[in-house]
Design a protein with these regions (language model features):
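Structured beta-strand/loop patches that form or line metal/cofactor-binding pockets in enzymes
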Residues: 1-27
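Short, conserved beta-strand edge motifs with alternating hydrophobic and charged residues
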Residues: 1-2, 111-114
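Anionic group-transfer/hydrolysis microenvironments
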Residues: 23, 115-117
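A short, polar/charged loop-to-alpha-helix boundary motif
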Residues: 40-59
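Glycine-rich phosphate/pyrophosphate-binding beta-alpha loops
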Residues: 6-10, 35-43, 70-72
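Hydrophobic "anchor" residues
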Residues: 30-31
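Rhodanese-like catalytic fold shared by cysteine-dependent sulfurtransferases
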Residues: 60-110, 117-150, 154-198
């Protein structure tokens, strides 16, 4: 299961975020299911994903889709393609971790926020240390290569880059936070609202 937070079109065209949750078979990366929360354009993306499921597509197939692009309707790389890219990374051994797992295991994790200090000040994952991506290589020299590490950014892309940096430096247990800080903050708000109702 993975989460992808991407806009339906570019920001300069008043793009609005959508959250795609996709389920892949971990043995063959076949797409098994998907859900999308968002505004305009979610119907297009869920139709593409439903068709992909019907034809037995896997993560790599999504990654290589050639979908129509025009700024009023989509980003250069469609959110469906990013979903395939994330799924493809996972099948190649890149591990993800959910917000729920981060909260449960918080004391056992080294959580690295690779965003800017300004973004970190606005909000961040509880217990995180701010190490901007450009400083990660030098900071990594101070870390235990066997420690369980979580990297994250706003939505997952830079967190994945940080994960790759650490893996290439020989770190053994590096996880990228699924959906990044946006997904984590949404999950926390949902838990607070749920407790209020109970």
């Amino acid at each position: 299961v993975l989460h992808n937070v991407k806009p339906n079109r570019p920001k300069y065209m008043q793009g609005q975020e959508m959250v795609i949750k996709a389920i892949f078979d971990k043995n063959n990366s076949k797409l098994l299911g998907a859900q999308i929360i968002g505004y305009e354009g979610v119907d297009k993306r869920i139709d593409v994903l439903a068709t992909a499921i019907t034809f037995g597509a896997n993560a790599e197939d999504l990654f290589h889709l050639d979908l129509a692009y025009a700024p009023p309707f989509s980003t250069t790389k469609d959110p469906v393609i990013y979903t395939g890219m994330i799924g493809h990374n996972i099948t190649r051994g890149r591990k993800i971790i959910t917000p729920e797992e981060v909260i449960k295991q918080n004391n056992d994790l080294l959580i690295l926020d690779v965003r800017s200090p300004k973004q970190f000040e606005v909000n961040h994952v509880d217990g995180a240390i701010n190490v901007p991506l450009k400083m990660l290589r030098s900071y990594a020299k101070t870390l235990d290569k066997n420690q369980k590490i979580v990297t994250y950014c706003n939505k997952g892309t830079t967190g994945n880059a940080a994960q790759n940096v650490l893996i290439n430096l020989g770190f053994k247990q590096v996880f990228n936070l699924s959906g990044g800080n946006k997904n984590y903050q949404r999950y926390k708000r949902f838990q607070v609202e749920r407790k209020k109702k109970n």
